Amino acid sequence: MHALLTRLAERFPDAVLAVREEGPYKDLVAQVKPAAVPEIARFLHDDPEAAFDMLSDMLAVDYPEDEDRFEVIYLLKSLPRNHRLRLKARLPEDDPTIPTVTTVWKGANFLEREVFDLMGITFAGHPDLRRILMPEDYDEGYPLRKDFPTEGRGWRSTFPFLPRLDEPAAPMASEVPEDQHRPFLKEAEGLPKDTKAVRRQEELLLNMGPQHPATHGVLRMVLELEGERIVKATPDLGYLHRGVEKLCEGLAYQQIIPHTDRLDYVCSMTNNYAYVRAVEKLLNLAVPPRAEYIRTVVAEMQRIIGHLFWLGTQALDIGAMTVFFWTFREREVLLDIFEKLCGARLTLNYYRIGGVDSDFTPDLVQRLGAFLDTFPAHLHEYDELLLTNRIWLARTKHVAVISAEDAVNFGCTGPVLRGSGVAYDIRKAEPYGAYDKVEWEVPVGKNGDTYDRYWVRLEEMRQSAKIIRQCLAQMPEGPIIADAPQIIPPPKQKVMRDMESLIHHFIIFTQGFKPPKGETYCSSEAPKGELGFFIVSDGGPKPYRMKIRSPSFVHLGAFDHMARGYLIADIVTIFGTYDVVMGECDR
Amino acid sequence: MDMLVFAGASVAKIAVVMVTVLITVAILTLAERKVLSWMQDRMGPMEVGPYGILQPIADGIKLFFKEDIIPAGANWVLFSLAPIISLIPAFIGFAVVPYGPNIEYELYGVTIKPFIISDINIGILYVLAFASIGAYGVILGGWASNNKYSLLGGLRAAAQVISYELNVGLAIIGVLILAGSLSLVTIAEKQAGGFWHWNLIGGLQIIGFVVYVISSVAETNRLPFDLPEADSELVAGWMTEYSGMRFAFFFMAEYANMILVSCIASVLFLGGYHAPYPGTLLPGILGYFEGVAWFTVKVYFFLFLFFWIRATLPRLRYDQLMRFGWKVMLPLALANIVITAIVVYVLR
């Protein structure tokens, strides 16, 4: 038994119901009483040996047959100790209430709202418990509960809160109905309607998005302004919510891979990678070395694409339009390589459970080498336009500053966290693929401002190029997919010729494979941050519950904290610096 | 009879200048897209006509036939008036710009200067005055749209125009001291005889030139000073609610303003229609057109500079713009005045 679990059980003999190490990877799990969660969370956060300073993710699982129907799971991560813990609490159906942990981890704010929204669990003491992904006046229940049909309840025309397209629009006295006036001004609530004197009159409520040139998709931001200065920024998410987690509960494990492409559509390969790694972890399946190298190379190519895309759009938001076109020029080269590799350019689907779909061809390796030869010169071109540009410095230095402590507390990961000076990179902390076999460094910033995050991302592109080069040099010969006939179908050529292989193929694709009963959380370093998949398996061919830990969603939880006090012009800089992709954020 | 001849000649000159300016605006819309494209490794418009040269015509037709929308909450009088207020001052300024040599013809007893519409002795003051009126179009357009983004754009425009117009005015005072006149013709004439006589080099108006160029970029709301428009922050700033021809008016005004400030810059600092060498190479009447050609080259140099800056620099933030205007540009312009005044006083 892990020392930490013993310590926890001894410290809270009444509140901790059970501690155990689960699965082949010995995940630490602690089952606790719901009422004691804040106390235990505080202990786990403060205790120097536990030091769980980050709440990676939280979710709820619905077990309708059980006595205590809901299980709330907190996925904790300790950066100094580099270990993880799953904290679980069971809640009954008639009173699904649990105290909030926002007092311990500020990042829990959005995560708890999501659990409330999708599973209907109330968090007592939460400062702002509203729906987050579904519309605020959504009245049809909680979508992730098992008794909610996958196809949804009703359709567009049956929801009274959505405007009908076939009827003339109802006349409205003003754009905002009277009773919804200023719903974002929490302080004004509970006061008689005519007491306006509590707030100064100069404040301007500006609605930014969901249709706005700089919101990178369909993010809506309600800004309270004093002149051009931001007093409060309230992100409104969910315009791109497609219920991927619910959909995945109805799909076999292989069928989910294409759905992960559509999460972060800028870096679809990374999502594929994160997902197949989670399934492999669940299956405890070893991947052949050549496949690991290929996966690493492709993931790093995707990281370069993601960062190029980010650099272009961030620069465009700030007004430097040339960088945008130049980065897209380089991105195009890599997309062509992807097209050679798997036939697609945007929603790529190359990773397979247990390996990859096809091998590198010599032509592809040669093209990739040619790209790597010219890439440093191109990076230098961007540097010439931006790195020492006075206006660029003025627009990014000391803008959207977040301290290392706050960044960790909000659950920020990836370049956002590293820009604040925390050298946390999952590729180093929990190595996977071929990352532990090549030489590379984790760039970290100092001040946690937009410029540092810009610098970190540019440096990461250089490191990625370095990783790809080494991987190509070291790449061993061998199979590209694991030898596990229970899980992996035979190669297509054999299927077309050989009767037994055809049957084998048919069985896997009609019945799926059945991983052992259990749970697993597996995180990967996506260009945006920590992309994690939490899968609960009931032993069937479909996941019982799948939760996606999306870095963009967690980062937007810190938006208000980072935006307050800056000017309207900085809002677009802050949007850009997170590198949000709403497909991943809203899922 | 005299009046008739004078009026006829003036109308003819106005017609030529207006047509030239409008054609230049059309050329600029294409040139800007082409120049930016080449700087950004792409081709720009290629579909309409060979190499996309008919693109401005297609754009014009499109804008002309677009639906004209006035938002429900807008003040329609000011909303319709704003593009006109923007456009007219932009065109009116060209009346005092000398395009070619200062020659005079006798036509039925009336003296006519063919290369300038009207040589009034306060030419530069006239240009500055009308440039300020143009700003009202932006402010009113932003206010009348009844849109928060437009309002913010309009407010930014007001602040920006006030700050930078001051700098434009102060930057050219050095030139005025050297020329001893407010007439653009006189200023140009004083710079005759080769590039070492130009105000930029011979008059050592380098600070004034730099301040003027930067401030005029700001005054025309171009990157990196396009805060009133700021497409990534304020959607399109004061133009957010405008469409069709009203939008085209604002657009034309912006480009006409660019041409105007380029014309003024070349007259004030680069000798206007004077070639960089003394006299002209071509004899007689062709020599006049040599001057016009040199003037055109200088104006296009400035216009190219606008595009070049746009392709290179990010946008400033509002507070940085203000700080830059008041704390950097203004002291520089004042220093330029003081130095020029002292030097001129000592040398005379």
Give the label of every model feature segment:
Chain A
Residues 1-229, 388, 392-394, 399, ...:
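Terminal low-complexity/charged segments
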Residues 164-587:
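Metal/cofactor-centered catalytic core regions of large enzymes
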